[in-house]
Regions:
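Phosphate/pyrophosphate-binding catalytic cores of soluble transferases and nucleic-acid-acting enzymes
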Residues: 1-274
C-alpha cells in the first residue's frame, strides 16, 4: 500500500506558509520545505523563512539544516526529504511538502534517478574554466545549443547545474531534460495529493513588491553584510538566491540600492510567473 504525501506549491507570496500550517493542524501533518534557500542557516529575511512562532508547534524539516557554504542540489534534497519522511511516517503523521522548487518536488514524488552517469573531471574542469573566462551566460548558451529545454529550466547563474547538463549530454548523447522526463513518466511510489495555490496576478505583484520593501526594512542589507563578514561569497550556490545576489551587487558597489531593490522586485515577479 502506497504511503500518503501532500504537495502544496505555488508562486512566491501566494500564501503557502499560512495554508500549510492550517492544513497540517487539521490532518496531523508535518512539513518538509522544498525551498532551495530556506535550508540554509543565517539566511532568514531574504528567503522569507518561516519564524518559529509562525510554526504553531507543527514540526518543520529542511529548515536551517545547512551552512551557506554547503552545496544543496536535487540529489541532496531527495536524500534529506526521504529521511524526514521516515520520521514523519514513524510519528503516524502525513508529510506535507511545501515549496518551492518544482524540480525538487517532482524528483521526490517520482523518485527520479540522477545517477545514470559518472562525473568527467577533465571535461568538468574545462567547462569551469570557460565559465570563469567567458562568463556564466556563455556556458548557458552552449547548453541551449544542445538542450534548449534544460536551458529554459536552469538559470544561467546556476553554473554547477549547467555544467552537469552539458556533462550528461557529452557522456550519454542524451539530453538530461529527456532523461528526467522519462524518469518522471514512472508511476509515483506515493499516494499523493498535489495542490497549487494561485491568485490574481496584480494582487500577487503588489504583495511581492510589499514583501521586498518589508525585507529591506527588516534588515536584509544587514543580513547579507553579516554573511559577507562570515566569509560567504557570491560564487556559492546559497548566495546566488534571489535577494542575496542583488544586495551583494549593491554592497560591492556595483549598483545603487534603488537599482538593487528594483531588480529584486522585477526578478521575483518573473520567478512567480514561472511558478503560476
Amino acid at each position: 500500500m502506497k504511503k500518503p504525501i501532500i504537495i502544496l506549491t505555488g508562486p512566491t507570496a501566494v500564501g503557502k506558509t499560512k495554508a500549510s500550517i492550517e492544513l497540517a493542524k487539521k490532518i496531523g501533518g508535518e512539513i518538509i520545505s522544498a525551498d532551495s534557500m530556506q535550508v540554509y542557516k543565517y539566511m532568514d529575511i531574504g528567503s522569507a523563512k518561516i519564524r518559529s512562532e509562525e510554526m504553531q508547534g507543527v514540526p518543520h524539516y529542511l529548515i536551517d539544516e545547512l551552512e551557506p557554504d554547503e552545496e544543496f542540489h536535487v540529489v541532496r534534497f531527495q536524500e534529506m526529504a526521504k529521511q524526514a519522511m521516515k520520521k514523519i511516517y514513524a510519528n503516524g503523521h502525513i508529510p506535507i511538502v511545501v515549496g518551492g522548487t518544482g524540480f525538487y518536488i517532482q524528483a521526490l514524488l517520482y523518485d527520479i534517478d540522477f545517477t545514470e552517469s559518472n562525473e568527467d573531471s577533465f571535461y568538468r574542469e574545462e567547462l569551469e574554466r570557460l565559465a570563469k573566462e567567458k562568463g556564466a551566460e556563455y556556458l548557458h548558451e552552449e547548453l541551449r545549443k544542445v538542450d534548449e529545454k534544460s536551458a529554459e529550466m536552469i538559470h544561467a547563474n546556476n553554473v554547477k547545474r549547467v555544467i552537469r547538463a552539458l556533462e550528461f549530454f557529452k557522456q550519454t548523447g542524451q539530453k538530461i531534460s529527456e532523461h528526467n522526463e522519462t524518469e518522471r513518466a514512472k508511476e509515483s511510489p506515493y499516494d499523493f495529493c498535489y495542490f497549487v495555490l494561485t491568485d490574481d496576478r496584480k494582487l500577487l505583484y503588489d504583495r511581492i513588491n510589499l514583501r521586498v520593501d518589508q525585507m529591506v526594512q527588516d534588515g536584509l542589507l544587514e543580513e547579507v553584510q553579516s554573511l559577507k563578514e562570515r566569509g560567504y561569497t557570491k560564487d556559492m550556490v546559497s548566495m546566488q538566491g534571489l535577494g542575496y545576489k542583488e544586495v551583494l551587487d549593491y554592497l560591492d558597489g556595483n549598483c545603487a540600492l534603488e537599482e538593487a531593490v528594483y531588480i529584486l522586485k522585477r526578478d521575483t515577479r518573473h520567478f512567480a510567473d514561472r511558478k503560476s
